[in-house]
Amino acid sequence: VDAGQPAETATTPSRKKRGPKRKDPPGTPKNKAQRNFTDPDSRIMKNSDKAFIQAYNAQAIVDGESQVIIAADLTNKASDVTHLPDMVKQVESNLDRKPRELSADAGYFSEKNVTFLEKRKIAAYIPPDKQKHSASVEPPPRGRIPANLSCKDRMRRKLRTVRGRKTYALRKQIVEPVFGQVKTVQGVRQFLLRSKLK
């Protein structure tokens, strides 16, 4: 230790400043990324138990009167929001007509989807937010619809109307029994074939 310098600075070696951390180029898989060699079309998705599994995302539209599946698809994209337009087009193709109204859960809400349905003159009942079972029920809106409402706020308002509540409440009575029938009675809880093609 040099007598002319304080002890802490005398023992600290000088370091060069380092540059920014190296970044991997876009599209580079993470170090722990894995690939499924038996079914490369499938993707890792979160299931209803919040566990991550190798899976596909099954889509279905059910007719409200007959409780028959009128459109179905299997995708490897976890998010539901991008599938709504293709599913509606499939209904139109299968039935040779368009539906009058459509109810879906919050996973399908986007301004793009609502606009798509409005252009086709299909009444949409899709909550922009996940519905909480314990949420207090707000009174139905009164008066004219304010012109400056966002798409989300217009949909929230529509779902608070008497017709909106009634229509959206039927969604579970229409769709869930069909899924229950497929899973429980027919025993279809998983797909036994590999790849989207099959």
Description of each model-found segment:
Residues 1-198:
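Anion-binding and metal-coordination hotspots
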